[in-house]
Amino acid sequence: VKDFAPISLLAVVPNVLVVNAAKNPDKSVKEVIAHAKKEPGKLTYASAGNGTSIHLAGEVFASMAGVNILHIPYKGSGPAITDMLGGQVDLMFDSITSARPHIQSGKLRALGVTTAKRSGALPDVPTIAEAGVPGYEVSPWFAVFAPAGTPPEVVAKLNKVLNDAMKEPDTLKKLE
């Protein structure tokens, strides 16, 4: 990459596979896979839009699990969650941040996180790899970049400041 100078990786934030707890009987990733194989092309999954990490998480899942599920793109996570809660879609890959309140309320059931390791935000939820799709990992990340040609001493200073901030207990707590 010639246009940017990397400064710091800030966070890797898992996405989560959820179903509507009242309307979808699937209680595990393996059950979703069996359901999708029994009815190819019938199960739908919502995402925050085409090309988002959430969309890609669903496509990687479908490919690795060997299932045909229909992607329903929305204009953001909010409308997708609204339809997920209303039962208009069968599955959803979403950010933990958006989905967690609905998981905690019992309206959504979390089946797996997309990263290689479990999330501190949902420690009882297995990874999708653990839950039935070996090798599955989609790890969205957030980073800071500067324009190419930024003086190295500025990049180094920003790197230090950001890395120090990311170690602060308050920052770590907010990222859970």
Region spans (language model):
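Small-residue (glycine/proline)-centered packing/hinge motifs flanked by hydrophobic/aromatic residues
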Residues: 1, 117-135
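Hinge/capping helix and adjacent helix->loop/strand transition within the periplasmic-binding protein
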Residues: 1-79, 128-130, 141-174
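Alpha-to-beta junction loops
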Residues: 39-43, 67, 85-94, 105-110, ...
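A ligand-binding cleft/hinge motif common to bilobed small-molecule-binding domains
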Residues: 55, 60-64, 90-125, 172
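Short, hydrophobic alpha-helical packing/hinge segments within bilobed ligand-binding/sensory domains
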Residues: 80-81, 99
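Active-site lining segments that contact anionic ligands and/or coordinate catalytic metals
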Residues: 108, 139-141
